[in-house]
Curated annotation (Swiss-Prot):
Pfam families: 7tm_1. Residues 49-62, 122-142, 210-366, 421-460 are cytoplasmic. Residues 328-343 have a biased composition (Basic residues). Keywords: Cell membrane, Disulfide bond, G-protein coupled receptor, Glycoprotein, Membrane, Phosphoprotein, Postsynaptic cell membrane, Receptor, Synapse, Transducer, Transmembrane, Transmembrane helix. This is Muscarinic acetylcholine receptor M1.
């Protein structure tokens, strides 16, 4: 949130001179107009993508959706009104429009900061408390937190901006100017800058550091776990074939149909290639799991009937409808079974941990991009706020204008961060821009043997 008034709206700084050259006016108007258009277009793409692509409807993306709403408000109203104010050199829309613009601008800006805090805390608890927090992490609870973030932003700024003049008994804002009346004192501006920018940034950076450390610890634990499963690594992947189970004492091979999974109730498992999962975005991966560490079906794409071991003769052939089993010997030259299931369990545990780690890294990458963009675009202006508290005339007017506009540019950059760090957003943006998205038609395209991927048909 912009915690001070811009140069043209500050009582301590003269407004933009009406005599600016036509080329300067044209350059400023075209540049800011393009930025506003890019901001509106990018954030509308986020909203439409969330609507048409069900894979994006994850809890984490609900926070991004709220952030996009705040950025859309800034791109639609704040950018254009501020540009008009700068180019005209005075506020010509009246006091009511001035107060409404400031209230909308500050509420949306503060909501952006609150949503960034929510995203940071959500990532932090998801990584540090995966079991207890994920059980409570529902869309309804996320919507409640988002609603509270907007409510707090509204309560903090809207009443004070709209009704301060009535509380003190007079309006002290100079004629032809538009700024927040109670922020005309530098010490108050300094306090709001500390509370609205520096404190949230400190909290977000601390949380991100904790997330980074926890993710690194998990990576080391996973490496140690994978290093201890030498029996499981020699047999290759177990995601595309069924093993026969030998007897407990190394007896001859069991007949077809008597495998280690025949004792379980029959069910159809959907196979997902592990390499393919690594290529999926964080949102789609999260939709494949119901809890922390739970891996989607990754064993076999077969339906095994229940077989009675006593009723089945050793020489009886399996029915035609039953799939053939593929025996894959271990290093010792015999099928995995009995004691061999223990390394297989470690292999599956390592795969689940790897899946969870990849997902968390993708989410952390999105968070880091958004946080970095926020710091880079908001820090210059808030540094100038601190400087002006102790030296009113030390900051040139042009720097004030650039710094204030740079805060708005953050709303332009955020959708780019989503696209760069999230494959689902990137692909959906591309299809929407090329007019190739049709959410009503889907087709199944096997990307690899043993895997099924659902993609939208691409037609305008």
């Amino acid at each position: 949130m912009n915690t001070s008034v811009p140069p043209a709206v500050s009582p301590n700084i003269t407004v933009l001179a009406p005599g600016k050259g036509p080329w300067q006016v044209a350059f400023i108007g075209i540049t800011t107009g393009l930025l506003s258009l890019a901001t509106v277009t990018g954030n509308l793409l986020v909203l439409i993508s969330f609507k048409v692509n069900t894979e994006l409807k994850t809890v984490n993306n609900y926070f991004l959706l709220s952030l996009a709403c705040a950025d859309l408000i800034i791109g639609t109203f704040s950018m254009n009104l501020y540009t008009t104010y700068l180019l005209m050199g005075h506020w010509a829309l009246g006091t009511l429009a001035c107060d409404l613009w400031l209230a909308l601008d500050y509420v949306a800006s503060n909501a952006s900061v609150m949503n960034l805090l929510l995203i940071s805390f959500d990532r932090y608890f998801s990584v540090t408390r995966p079991l207890s927090y994920r059980a409570k992490r529902t869309p309804r609870r996320a919507a409640l937190m988002i609603g509270l973030a907007w409510l707090v932003s509204f309560v903090l700024w809207a009443p004070a901006i709209l009704f301060w003049q009535y509380l003190v008994g007079e309006r002290t804002v100079l004629a032809g100017q538009c700024y927040i009346q109670f922020l005309s004192q530098p010490i108050i501006t300094f306090g709001t800058a500390m509370a609205a920018f520096y404190l949230p940034v400190t909290v977000m950076c601390t949380l991100y550091w904790r997330i980074y450390r926890e993710t690194e610890n998990r990576a080391r634990e996973l490496a140690a776990l994978q290093g201890s499963e030498t029996p499981g690594k020699g047999g290759g992947s177990s995601s595309s074939s069924e093993r026969s189970q030998p007897g407990a004492e190394g007896s001859p091979e069991s007949p077809p149909g008597r495998c280690c999974r025949c004792c379980r109730a029959p069910r159809l498992l959907q196979a997902y290639s592990w390499k393919e999962e690594e290529e999926e975005d964080e949102g789609s991966m999260e939709s494949l799991t119901s809890s922390e560490g739970e891996e989607p079906g990754s064993e076999v794409v077969i339906k095994m009937p229940m077989v009675d071991p006593e009723a089945q003769a050793p020489t009886k052939q399996p029915p035609k409808s039953s799939p053939n089993t593929v025996k894959r010997p271990t290093k010792k030259g015999r099928d995995r079974g009995g004691k061999g299931q223990k390394p297989r369990g470690k292999e599956q545990l390592a795969k689940r941990k790897t899946f969870s780690l990849v997902k968390e890294k993708k989410a952390a990458r999105t968070l880091s991009a958004i946080l970095l963009a926020f710091i880079l675009t908001w820090t210059p202006y808030n540094i100038m706020v601190l400087v002006s508290t102790f030296c009113k005339d030390c900051v040139p007017e042009t720097l004030w204008e650039l710094g204030y506009w740079l805060c708005y540019v953050n709303s332009t950059v955020n959708p780019m961060c989503y696209a760069l760090c999230n494959k689902a957003f990137r692909d959906t943006f591309r299809l929407l821009l090329l007019c190739r998205w049709d959410k009503r038609r889907w087709r199944k395209i096997p990307k690899r043997p043993g895997s099924v991927h659902r993609t939208p048909s691409r037609q305008c």
